[in-house]
Structure formats: C-alpha cells, structure tokens
Amino acid sequence: MAAAAAFFCALLFISVQHGVLGGYTRNDFPADFVFGAATSAYQYEGAAAEDGRGASIWDTFTHAGKMKDKSTGDVASDGYHKYKGDVKLMTETGLEAYRFSISWSRLIPSGRGAVNQQGLKYYNNIIDELTKRGIQVHVMLYHLDLPQALEDEYAGWLSPRIVEDFTAYADVCFREFGDRVSHWTILAEPNVAALGGYDTGEFAPGRCSDPFGVTKCTVGNSSVEPYVAAHNMILTHAAVVRLYREKYQTLQKGIVGINVLSLWSYPLTDSTADLQAAQRYKDFTYGWILHPLVFGDYPQVMKKAIGSRLPSFSKVQTELVKGTLDFIGVNHYFSLYVSDLPLAKGVRDFIADRSVSCRGLLQGVRFIAQTMQAPTRSMGDPHGLQLMLQHLKESYGDLPIYVQENGKYRKASSNDSLDDTDRVDYIKGYIEGVLNATRNGVNARGYFAWFFVDMFELLSGYQTRYGLYRVDFDDAALPRRAKRSARWYRDFLKSKRQPLQIAQQ
C-alpha cells in the first residue's frame, strides 16, 4: 500500500546520485532467497457482490464517496475471474513467489460462522494454480478489509472481541490451506491501519476527531482510538500465532509473521535533538508494533509521550505477545529526513505524540505532515532500505526479513506508456539495497514487487499505477500488457547480469 506511506511524515523522497560498479545476478542472493510480486484482495479481486462475498469496511468506505476519484474496488483488476491468466503471466515472468491476501468477508461473509464455499473454492483454486506452476505461496490473512458486519456489531478493531473472531477465521485458513501454504503473514501494516483508519480518517473505517482528521469524520477519537486499535491488532496477532504453533506448525512446518510499513528516517542535522527525533520516528512507526512482539511491551519513548492513552499489557498478555514472530515483513518505498519538535501541550493525536517534523529535499513539492496524500514524485533511496534492514537486525535480532512491498507508481493517463524505465531503475536500485544488506549479515529472505498488475490503490483509486503489468481500466475486458519493468524483472530472474548501483552521497 504504497500511497499509505505518505501519512507517516511529510513524505521525503531522497534524491540519490548513482555510479556503476560491477554487477549482480539472481545467483548473488542466498539460495533460500525468493523473488516475487504481490497483490491484496480488495485492490485486486473485484467481484464485490459475487458468490456470497460479504461487505468489508472498504466497500462501505468507497461507496460513501470517500475516494478522491469517487472510485471503488467493486471490479478492481478482476482477479476473481482473471487469476489463471495472471498466474500464467507470473510463470512467464519467472516469479518464484507470489504474495496475496485473503478476503475475510469472502471466506466468512459475516466475519464469524459459516464458511462461504464459493470463497473457499476460489482460494483453493489460486493456491493450486500457483503450486502447479512451482510458485511459492505467501498468504496474508488480513489486508485492512475487515468484514463490515463486525464493524457494525462492535466497532471492529476497537473491541477486544475481535481477537476471538479473527482467530477463528485464521483457524479456517490454516486448516483449509495450510497443506500448501508455508508462509503466513497475519496482518498487513497495522501501523497504517491504526493511523489511517482511526486518526486521520483517510482509510476505512474512516474514524477521526477534530482537529486531527484530514476529512470531516462523524465518529472517532484521534487521541485514543489509534492506540486501542493497534493494541487489539497486536493481541490478535499473538493469539493467532499461538494457535498456529500449538495446532498446525509441527505438521505443516510453516512460519508466521507480521507486516509493517518501515520507512527509513535520517536526522536532518547532527544535533542530539534531531538524532533522537530520527530514532523516535522509528520507534513510533514500526517499533510500535514490533517491540511488543519481540520484547513484550511498547517502546519506552511511546509510553512516556502518550501516557495513559496507550493501553498496557497485563503480565499474561506480555507473555502471550512476546516472541511471536518467525519473520518480519516490511513495506518500504522511500526515506525521509526528520527533525525534533517540542511535544505539544493539550490534546494530541499520534502525529503530535511523535513530535517530529519531516523535511523534503525537492523544491516545489509540498507535502502535508498530517495527511496520507499520495506523493506526486518518487525518487528512491535504496541505501535507506539497506540501513532499515540493518537497523531491524540490530534492534530485533536475527529474524528472517521479507521485503513484502516495494515499488514506484506513475500517475494514470489516457496514453499510459509501457516504457517505465524509471520504475526499472527504482526496482534495480532497491534490489541492490537488499543485496548489500544480506552481505552485511541481514537475514533477508525475499523481495516482492508491488503490484504485479495495476490495481485499485487505497488512497488514490485508479489515479496511480504501480504494476509490472498494465491493466487498461477503460476496457471492460481489463487486458494486461507487460511494461518494461516486467521484462526487466523476467530477465533478472533468468540471471542476466545487472549493473550494480552504488549510492554516492
């Protein structure tokens, strides 16, 4: 969910000069490293009202006209009907792995109770098709698309009741698909879901309170709800991991982890205050989620700044959540510079609690720190990804790490070009960043391009394109055509030598 990254700060994109030295091939990566691409259910599947699928909070959000282009994911890329052709394209591209998410409301329309047999058949068909073609299956149980029935019943992630219902849903997935799926990500970007859905109001379910919401929300509390939602997501993750480890892992031999948006933050200056601000940004962004799952509690800097608004873990909960990661999944798109801000007095939200200011280097490009607005330009910083991966190792130990989303978008236009050389350069540079991290001892296990095909974007609808394959959304047949980036990825995966990009500050 690349556009979502923008909300975490004024979205700085680092401009990096590159020189060429040597080269790399697919074979320069460890033998157990996989290259793939990814999609998510609401953004890809479409078929919103077909075969018994229940509504999700994103259906409600988009149908209320909340998207800037007034679009919905009702059709999206029509992956529900076109998955076989897309898997064929994956094979032709040489993908070694594919990461997709399951729509909870397609599998269990009301969020609990009876399984929708048509939904079960659909996901079995996808998994079988991938397995038949030798593509490793990576499944994400939740990509921000909560069943609307549970939102209506008890406000979804704001209630501890979500833990039981989600765990029951996960049990169905492990039971039905676990014989062919060995890589499970429980939640996608809980840091994004909590902030965008419950502070700024720019993501479903669109809750916020004045003066913090970017749009006018009718319900919400931006000072409290982001922390409550994230807390329940952490407890849910832990409960699902315990279920998997106790009931399935010995037999299925799979691994379970979580996914977080993980941008790199540089201090704007070398002052002590800015150095602390850069670390505070990391603690508030991904330490918010990872620190409890590794150590059993929130970062101390968050506890101090937020106080009683931050939920606490009981002793039993601490033992439940601690050590519940077999791997870390990260979504990374760019880096940013941050500087210190004094902690504001009075009512604060997450952004004010974090107390940092973000700066960009590109003149004439405005970003607003309080929003998640999609950036208009993206200049990559592969070295930032390398530093972020190394920081995760230093902070959380030698856990395997998968880069589960990385990509660059272009604005949609009537004459979308297939010649996306800028995306090729971007991906090439970021793969180099991962390679350098592995050479420095990081236990990186995979890289997934985001998206495989153009899809509905959660912030910008159909106004931006991330895919390796172009989807013509003006054609009812939604034909796919390979972009230059798809051809480059195919050649790379066939081990053709690629120029190595060396960052020069």
Curated annotation (Swiss-Prot):
Glycosylation sites: N221, N415, N436
Keywords for the protein's UniProt record, in alphabetical order: Disulfide bond, Glycoprotein, Glycosidase, Hydrolase, Signal
Entries under SUPFAM superfamilies matching the protein: (Trans)glycosidases
Gene3D superfamilies linked: Glycosidases
E.C. no: 3.2.1.21
Cysteines paired by S-S bonds: C208-C217
Catalytic residues identified in the record: E189 (proton donor), E405 (nucleophile)
InterPro entries according to UniProt: Glyco_hydro_1 (IPR001360), Glyco_hydro_1_N_CS (IPR033132), Glycoside_hydrolase_SF (IPR017853)
Catalytic activity: Hydrolysis of terminal, non-reducing beta-D-glucosyl residues with release of beta-D-glucose
Biological process according to GO: carbohydrate metabolic process
Entry annotated with the keyword Flavoprotein: no
Domain of life: Eukaryota
Gene Ontology molecular function terms on file: beta-D-fucosidase activity; beta-galactosidase activity; beta-glucosidase activity
Keyword Hydrolase recorded: yes
Family: Belongs to the glycosyl hydrolase 1 family.
This protein's name: Beta-glucosidase 3
Lineage: Eukaryota, Viridiplantae, Streptophyta, Embryophyta, Tracheophyta
Gene: BGLU3
